[in-house]
Amino acid sequence: MWHAENCDLCGDCLVRCQYVDYDRVKAVQQIKQLMAGKPAEILELCITCVACNEYCPTAANPFDLINRLQEVHKSLPIPEKSRKFMDAGGTMPSALIKGDDSKPALSMCVMEPFISNDAVGGRMFEDMTVVKGGEYFCYLGYVHIGMDSPLIENARGFIDKLAGIEAKEIVFFHPDCYAMISKMPDYGIEVPFKAIHIIEYMRNYLKAHSDEVVPLNRKIAYQRPCASRYSGEIETILDEMFDLIGVERVARKYDRESAQCCGSLFSRIYPDRIKPMMEANVEDASKAGAEAMVFLCPLCMGALARPAGEKGMKPVLLSQLARMALGELPFPA
């Protein structure tokens, strides 16, 4: 939620934006226009990476204002195909597969069609109750097509459906779902279960079963997804997980707070702007000495797997990497 009372017009959010070249005067001018509800230039140039929320030193959440006004002013030239893709999320076939009630449940959102069969399995996910499909769709992806209202309209149904599992704890495989949960206080909705980020769940499992872990001794580049901007506290947990499995997260330009969006959607909308940045992101990972490019979001992997492979880096989902450390999967040759 946008907190106008927190904004001191410092301009940091847009000065640090990697997708525009604003000095502080221009940045402040843009924020003032946004605060007045005007169709500021940034509404069209923003690629919805959410980074400005993380950059803001006063927790004003400028992206939330930008995103709301993108919808009001219809600022983004979203292809009809992309809108239909998003709308299809809520209509996908759903399933609830009962498991051991003493374990947390696992929500897959609508990600199952976008991952390989070995991404979820083995001892770490054994006997968990699993829910998946449109009935458990989180709707957060709509922010990437410049829309905020679908989140608000579907928030209650999202929580109610998950509550119907009657699980005390739910692990969210898709980072967007965990991000959506973080928005519930803004919507005045109580969450009647403990939400667990997939990274926290895997870290906890690996820590509890450290005697089963075989250090991988690999260097990887991590592609931080846009949804992680809503849950910055997970970064230290991820670093701990990498330490547990003997993986070095290479230091590079486009990581952590300076991570770039994968470009999956906006490379189609603004190819001249975004494709060179995607190439720079992958090149950055390669030059840092990464043997693999590791993804949390399956859609990020879909966008960057091929260019990463062309640079000699194996594309790997984070859950696959954890299973490799448990000896359940081989590190790709």
Please name every model-derived segment:
Residues 4, 21-178, 184:
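Iron-sulfur-cluster electron-transfer modules
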Residues 119-121, 128-193, 229-230, 236, ...:
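Cofactor-cradling patches in redox/metallo enzymes
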